[in-house]
Amino acid sequence: AGDCSTYDKKSIWSIPVGSNKMNIIKTEIPEVVIIEPIVRGDSRGYFMESFLKEKFEREVKSTIFVQENESISSYGVLRGLHYQLSPFSQSKLIRVVTGKIMDVAVDIRKGSPTFGKWVATILSGENKRQLFVPRGFAHGFSVLENDTVVQYKTDNYYAPEFEAAIRWNDPALSIDWGLPVSDIKLSEKDKYHPMLADARLFDYNENLYG
């Protein structure tokens, strides 16, 4: 059965000014991490550091991002659950520039103590949070507002021949996408992915960063 750890948004203006430039928030799946930049605003607008390599490598994961992608989507669009197989497996660091999504990471490492469990968190242009999804996980998101712009970094290049995916509504996962099912809009491709039980997966003991 699936499992969920959901973290709701926090207003960027409620974050206290301190010496740290971003907060690292652990989820119930230890490898999946929420990153919350410290935002400083006044009447002119705001400023934040959206990525700090040294802090990220020290507190999250030592990896090198090589590609950044951007999409814009309307309300109800659902993309996922996507991943790439070895040797082109990818970590992702996802953020929302404008709008709001429910962002989901699913552990698909056979033998993992959290295999088949998932984390869901709201990322928005307001809360400025980011989600780190490591290799060995499937990723997807549902769009909760029109004209939502999503950016994400990856630590491996896009390799279409190594693409894989799991059905968004697999009952073994029972993911809550935060939308009425009748509002969900899918690509033709995303409608017909295999269920978790039939998908190509990772092994927990495999060194995906080797």
Regions found by a protein language model. Name each.
Residues 123-146:
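Conserved metal-binding segment of the jelly-roll/cupin
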Residues 21-126, 146-147, 154-210:
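Non-catalytic, conserved peripheral segments adjacent to functional cores
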